[in-house]
């Protein structure tokens, strides 16, 4: 709701308490244009009201007439009320000291990183760095991440994060399938690999015909596998020398993936030095809270020969237009938005913000600090092992880094009971064994408590920590042959910023280079760069959410699970489906899960042969990439001249593949930014031929409260909580991609059987390492919905549509709007056609994108879904003033193009071809251009008081891919 002006309220007598209480409504903070601005935009469009506009935009046949059924969340809460309600849920969680391990560890997030990265909108509101000139800060941070990983693993090249360790291992499996022995379909997993990793691998392997075998690592060379996965150290703590085994696997024609603990690699010989081909793992213990399972940044590193087969994003070094070093995303032709079903992976959003945190943890501590932490962890583990042996227990593993497995026999239940009394969680290995994993937060007092637990179970007295320390001498529990001797993190960036003053200034210097939502609108089509409100972000840092282990006992996570249940029901209401799973930790994973659910449904009906997926030509690249991963055959459906699905072609393809039709994947509103009038007919055609309808939820920001995929024929959708429901993009992640399904598909929602989590009675296997995926950022979406309430969520959708149509209307005289619905109206985004401009002037869409940087804007989405176009999505959060500033910039750029067309400006020496202009270029002694310095840097008057300077000139993409270099740049190169 929009609030009355206080002057009008003050003139009303008497003032009611209810009228005054509405002044804390969150909606007017979230929705950018006020009532007067909205009316001005409606006047421009020729509509009397927002309701009239919506009636004209959305087909009546799919309109949702009832208010969103949000139950207890129908009425909006103030920011304070919502925080208090969420605090009450958080307080139901119990924060125990968790020594469960299994890939997750408590950690200290350095306060300077917490405040200046995780809590800093300059970092968390940025977009994926596809526009490198305005992304140099986070690109440098991600390059640091890659350098950190390659140094610690001993491999040649690393990507800039994946979703979690289990997903990274599954990606490594498919990578090795592409490069491995052609006659084998076997992937061998050692029996001491993390159980959640094995389950995700099995899920990934099944639809693409990979046979996953498990057994002792020693048997791997005889398995005839194209790839072998080893854990280093193993889940039970063993540290094994795999040199001979790796040689044997290679001799048999296989390749080796090692899931390695990065902290352990500061003291253990890295996998790259003993022959591993690929290394994967999690960087969570580098300063990122456990968060009930995520989000955390995984890594994947490879030998040099496999670099073009890597999944995920890769930061590389190039030069700019002036020959200075610049950073960019390299080898993008591997990615799904270009290669589609032939991509190396369907991963789009990764975990950039968490990768940045982990890299800064390494920068802050440096090699000496990291090694000190590792040695202390190992020392405490060794003291614990010595102590329990004194108490009469046997340890299962004599070599270890941080994890000791204890043979507790008949006293196992007692050990857990006594630990529980001290608010300690231990790993339940079996009825006869207990696991204890030490982390950087473990103190000598914690060690004393652990020993007291085992002493109580043994009926003895715990040895003192000091006595154990003195008696153990300098012994370590690491095999002498595996103690690391090679140097790591030698680059200056890891050896300079160790005081808080230096670290603070380094972080500030990086964030100052970038353009994020804290500076200006980011009008990226299909990306929904809306407000990420501070009140939504606050709970992410609460320890009641951050310090919970994903495998903690259920009685300790009551508040988490209640919050998750409530959020699932909120999303059920928004989508019109029957059930939601929050396990997928990215939109790509939600897509993949949805397609696996469709396959499971068909198989349950004896129709497992259905494997054809119809996908419109306009679809986002993740759609065909996900379908391929799910074992489906992609058949492309044509679009007509208006950008809609070609009904005649759809009917023909559905008829042709009727016996094997599994699904259609459509996006609604379409990727062309239009509400297709015949969406119900599309659904009916597919259903008539036995298929299911997958509605991609990427554009859900145009539907909430107005229509719902579950009500117009959809069977399954994924959502992007990092778009519609306010989780920030973080410069390329984290994201959450819930999968929502109709009632007939609910029993197929993903489980995680390895940890006892069961959602669907016939559920598919796990698609993420943790049962609830990236659980610790779910409070963001919970807060957003709770503070908006039903009517304001609908108002937000309507305003997003209003803002998009206002931009389209005002820019139409200057740039053709490529697609529109009845009355020339668009949905929540519009596509501007720049192809005629290229023909008339030689100016490209890339030139316009770079020139927008000089005006202080991130470019709209380039060349998707149509090459040579810009797709603009303003969202509901931008004010009319900001929309007008963007419109004025685009009109001014059109005038600059017109000068080229008319011969008043040179076709090569003009401000567009040389954009962006850095401060160094503009202030240089020599100015070689025909246009003025003022036109280059200050083309509109508003920049005089608010100027953003790109830190580098135009990046040379071709040079970067020809001369691939993906590690930190020596300081001398910047001279």
UniProtKB/Swiss-Prot annotation:
Designated gene of the protein: gcvP
The entry's keywords: Oxidoreductase, Pyridoxal phosphate
Enzyme Commission number(s) of this protein: 1.4.4.2
KW Transcription (keyword) present: no
Catalytic reaction list: N(6)-[(R)-lipoyl]-L-lysyl-[glycine-cleavage complex H protein] + glycine + H(+) = N(6)-[(R)-S(8)-aminomethyldihydrolipoyl]-L-lysyl-[glycine-cleavage complex H protein] + CO2
In-chain residues carrying the UniProt-annotated modification N6-(pyridoxal phosphate)lysine: 723
GO MF annotation terms: glycine binding; glycine dehydrogenase (decarboxylating) activity; pyridoxal phosphate binding
Ranges that cross the membrane: none
Alphabetical list of Gene3D superfamilies matching this protein: Aspartate Aminotransferase, domain 1, Type I PLP-dependent aspartate aminotransferase-like (Major domain)
Names of the cofactor(s): pyridoxal 5'-phosphate
Protein name (record): Glycine dehydrogenase (decarboxylating)
């Amino acid at each position: 709701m929009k609030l009355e002006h206080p002057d009008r309220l003050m003139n009303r007598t008497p003032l009611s308490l209810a009228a005054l209480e509405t002044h804390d409504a969150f909606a007017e903070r979230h929705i950018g244009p006020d009532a007067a601005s909205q009316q001005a935009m409606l006047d421009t469009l020729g509509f009397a009201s927002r309701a009239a506009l919506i009636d004209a935009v959305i087909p009546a046949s799919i309109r949702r007439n009832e208010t969103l059924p949000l139950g207890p969340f129908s009425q909006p809460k103030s920011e304070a009320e919502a925080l208090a309600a969420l605090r009450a849920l958080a307080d139901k969680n119990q924060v125990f000291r968790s020594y469960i391990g299994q890939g997750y560890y408590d950690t200290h997030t350095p306060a300077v990183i917490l405040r200046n990265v995780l809590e800093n909108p300059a970092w968390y509101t940025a977009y994926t760095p596809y526009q490198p000139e305005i992304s140099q800060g986070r690109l440098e941070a991600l390059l640091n991440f890659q350098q950190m990983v390659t140094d610690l693993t001993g491999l040649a090249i690393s990507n800039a994060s994946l979703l979690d360790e289990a997903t990274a291992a599954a990606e490594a499996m498919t990578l090795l399938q592409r490069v491995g022995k052609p006659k084998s379909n076997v992937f061998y997993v050692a029996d001491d690999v993390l159980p959640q990793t094995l389950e995700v691998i099995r899920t990934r392997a099944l639809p693409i015909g990979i046979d996953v075998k498990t057994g002792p690592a020693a048997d791997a060379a005889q398995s005839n596998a194209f790839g072998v996965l080893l854990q280093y150290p193993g889940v039970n703590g063993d540290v094994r020398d795999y040199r001979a085994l790796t040689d044997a696997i290679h001799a048999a024609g296989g390749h080796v993936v090692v899931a390695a603990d990065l902290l352990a690699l500061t003291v253990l010989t890295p996998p790259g030095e003993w022959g591993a081909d690929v290394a994967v793992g999690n960087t969570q213990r580098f300063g990122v809270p456990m968060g009930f399972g995520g989000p955390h940044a995984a890594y994947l590193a490879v030998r040099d020969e496999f670099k073009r087969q890597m999944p995920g994003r890769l930061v590389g070094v190039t030069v700019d237009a002036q020959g200075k070093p610049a950073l960019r995303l390299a080898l993008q032709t591997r990615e799904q938005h270009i290669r589609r079903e032939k991509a190396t992976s369907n991963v789009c959003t990764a975990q950039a913000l968490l990768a940045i945190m982990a890299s800064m943890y390494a920068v802050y501590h440096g090699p000496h600090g990291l090694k000190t932490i590792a040695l202390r962890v190992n020392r405490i583990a060794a003291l614990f092992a010595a102590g329990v042996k004194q108490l009469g227990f046997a340890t299962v593993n004599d070599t270890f880094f941080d994890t000791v497995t204890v043979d507790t026999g008949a006293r196992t239940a007692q050990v857990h009971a006594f630990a529980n009394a001290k608010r300690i969680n231990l790993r339940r290995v079996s009825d006869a064994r207990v696991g204890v994993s030490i982390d950087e937060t473990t103190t000598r007092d914690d060690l004393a408590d652990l020993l007291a637990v085992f002493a109580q179970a043994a009926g003895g007295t715990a040895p003192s920590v000091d006595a154990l320390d003195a008696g153990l001498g300098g012994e370590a529990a690491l095999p002498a042959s595996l103690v690391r001797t090679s140097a790591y993190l030698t680059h200056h960036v890891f050896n300079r910023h160790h005081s808080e003053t230096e670290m603070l200034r380094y972080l500030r210097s990086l964030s100052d280079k970038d353009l994020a939502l804290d500076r200006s609108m980011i009008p990226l089509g299909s990306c929904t760069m809306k407000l990420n409100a501070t009140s939504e972000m606050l709970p992410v840092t609460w320890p009641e959410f951050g310090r919970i282990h994903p495998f903690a006992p259920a009685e300790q996570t009551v508040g988490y699970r209640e919050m998750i249940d409530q959020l699932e029901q909120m999303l059920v209401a928004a989508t019109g489906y029957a059930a939601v799973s929050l396990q997928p930790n990215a939109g790509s994973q939600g897509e993949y899960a949805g397609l696996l659910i469709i396959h499971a449904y068909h198989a349950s009906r004896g129709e497992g042969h259905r494997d054809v997926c119809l996908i419109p030509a306009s679809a986002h690249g993740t759609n065909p990439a996900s379908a391929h991963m799910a074992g489906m055959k992609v058949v492309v459906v044509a679009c007509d001249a208006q950008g809609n699905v070609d009904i005649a072609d759809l009917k023909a393809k559905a008829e042709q593949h009727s016996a094997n039709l599994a699904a259609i994947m459509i996006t609604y509103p379409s990727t062309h930014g239009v509400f297709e009038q015949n969406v119900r007919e599309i659904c009916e055609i597919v259903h008539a031929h036995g298929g299911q309808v997958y509605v991609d939820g990427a554009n859900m920001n145009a539907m909430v409260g107005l229509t719902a995929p579950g009500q117009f024929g959809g069977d399954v959708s994924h959502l992007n909580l990092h778009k519609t429901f306010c989780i920030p993009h973080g410069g390329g992640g984290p994201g959450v991609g819930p999968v929502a399904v109709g009632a007939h598909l609910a029993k197929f929602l993903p489980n995680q059987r390895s940890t006892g989590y069961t959602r669907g009675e016939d559920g598919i296997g796990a698609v993420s390492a943790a049962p609830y995926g990236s659980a610790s950022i779910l409070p963001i979406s919970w807060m957003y919905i709770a503070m908006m309430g039903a009517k304001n969520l609908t108002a937000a959708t309507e305003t997003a549509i209003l803002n998009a149509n206002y931009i389209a209307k005002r820019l139409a005289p200057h740039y053709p709007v490529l697609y529109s619905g009845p009355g020339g109206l668009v949905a929540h985004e519009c596509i501007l056609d720049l192809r005629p401009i290229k023909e008339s002037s030689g100016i490209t869409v890339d030139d316009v994108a770079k020139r927008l940087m000089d005006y202080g804007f991130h470019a709209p989405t380039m060349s998707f879904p149509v090459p040579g176009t810009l797709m603009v999505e303003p969202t509901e959060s931008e004010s009319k003033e900001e929309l007008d500033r963007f419109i004025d910039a685009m009109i001014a750029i059109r005038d600059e193009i017109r000068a080229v067309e008319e011969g008043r400006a040179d076709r090569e020496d003009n401000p567009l071809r040389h954009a962006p202009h850095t401060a160094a270029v503009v202030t240089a002694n020599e100015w070689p251009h025909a246009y003025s310095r003022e036109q280059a840097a200050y083309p509109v008057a508003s920049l005089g008081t608010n100027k953003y300077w790109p830190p580098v000139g135009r990046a040379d993409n071709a040079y970067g891919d020809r001369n691939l270099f993906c590690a930190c740049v020596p300081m001398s190169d910047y001279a």
